[in-house]
Amino acid sequence: MRPGRTLSVLILSVSTVSCAATTYDTSITAKPAPTTTVLPTGTAAVLLPQLVTEASTLSSLIVGQGDKLAVVERIEALWAAVSAEVTGKDRDLATEIGAEVVKGRTAAVLDRPASADKVYRDLTALVKAYLASA
């Protein structure tokens, strides 16, 4: 064997032997802080216009890299607070509003400002129809 080859084999052997399995200490992981959501209180006549106002800001937050998920969570909280009341009065409108709330989250997660604009337009029309019939 040539000296260069012997040295290469020796270095390869030493580096291979020095490899060890990697272990991860999972006891160090931090637990996420618990989150609590307090549902807004009020009637549908009060909270639904707030829902539309929140939806109006979603598109600009998606474009401007703002806290779009916070807006979505407020929209969802407002809807959760009044969905039973709206469903009791008009099940079809409640289904449509609920679907638009879901579409709002999808628009935010997928960064689609045009979809957020459509959600805002649809929610505006649906809330206007609900308030006119209430």
Which residues are covered by each model-predicted region?
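Immediate post-signal-peptide N-terminus of mature secreted/exported proteins
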Residues: 24-69
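C-terminal amphipathic alpha-helix
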Residues: 54-61, 108-134
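Short, solvent-exposed, charged loop/turn and helix-capping segments
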Residues: 76-100
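Short, charged, amphipathic alpha-helical segments
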Residues: 69-74, 94-99, 117-122
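Bacterial signal peptide processing site
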Residues: 19-23
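Sec-dependent bacterial lipoprotein signal peptides
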Residues: 1-17
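Selective transmembrane helix interface/packing segments
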Residues: 44-48, 94-97, 105, 111
